[in-house]
Amino acid sequence: MYLVREYLADSYVIDADVYINRNFIVTDINKSTYFSAYKRNVKNEWKLCFDENKKVNDIEIINGDGFILCGVSYWSKNDGILIKNRIEEVIKMDDFTNLYWDDIVKNNLKDLDVRIKEINDDDIYEIDNIEDLNMVKDIIENN
């Protein structure tokens, strides 16, 4: 993320390990948003905790069920600039060995205005291993 930090403001981020089964990308968006599906029986996934206004107030790593990070997000101009600045600070401290870029968001939620947009559980699939890849292949072939 460091290499593209200048482009975060007013931009979508789509992780490279996801298959989008239905286009849920919207053009009329102005608040930072995690697109999230409710997934069951997940292992070591990042769960979004949010209030009645859909404002994300925490991210927990869980085993079980919940609305999880699905690999698609949008970042407003202000939030994108803040994330860029925090990424630069972390790089300067040279302490980023086991750091995901989403850790920057997680650790700065109090300073960000991030919402959740709920999507269907079959709208997106994360491909972490050959089993996931084969499952997505079956979905594509059977549609």
Predicted regions and their residues:
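Structural signal for conserved beta-strand scaffold positions within catalytic alpha/beta enzyme cores
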Residues: 34-37, 58-61, 116-118
